[in-house]
């Protein structure tokens, strides 16, 4: 454990916090084993406690601004769908940056708050090899296929899909 230089009370609090972090990490690992979750290493820390909890996963990544939730969403016809923070080119950070420039941060957050229901209720459309779209009347969610039957949300567009 790293040495913390502070008052005795601060040192005690720091040690307690480190123990809590270790317990949380062990809990996440246990969830991954029980649910057979295989997070993609390139996306960093997996918040396994939000498995199949799209709304919770979204909130967690908005707070942490890094990492992933493997299996944040699930559809019977697709299986698990991962939500990753990503960077400026893909993932949740890309979606927020793009929508914040288009509108403002508040409206961008409101827009992505509908991600869970749009994934559940949208129509599947194959866009190109390795990419699938989930479309609703107002939005298009782009999923990239990663590995064996893993889908990662890479974009969320506001489109008026009149053909649905």
PLM feature segments, named:
Residues 1-164:
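Ribonuclease/tRNase effector modules and their secretory precursors
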């Amino acid at each position: 454990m790293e040495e913390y230089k502070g008052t005795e009370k601060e040192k005690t609090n720091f040690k307690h916090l480190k123990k809590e972090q270790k317990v949380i990490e062990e809990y996440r690992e246990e969830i991954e084993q029980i649910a057979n979750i295989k997070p993609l290493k390139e996306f960093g820390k997996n918040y396994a406690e939000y498995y199949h909890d799209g709304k919770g996963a979204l909130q967690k990544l908005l707070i942490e601004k890094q990492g992933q939730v493997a299996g944040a969403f699930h559809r019977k016809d697709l299986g698990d769908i991962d939500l990753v923070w990503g960077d400026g080119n893909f993932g949740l950070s890309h979606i927020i940056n793009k929508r914040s420039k288009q509108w403002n941060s508040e409206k961008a957050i409101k827009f992505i708050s509908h991600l869970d229901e749009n994934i559940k209720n949208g129509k599947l459309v194959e866009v190109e090899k390795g990419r699938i779209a989930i479309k609703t009347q107002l939005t298009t969610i782009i999923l990239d296929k990663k590995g064996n039957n893993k889908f990662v949300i890479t974009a969320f567009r506001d489109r008026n899909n009149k053909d649905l």
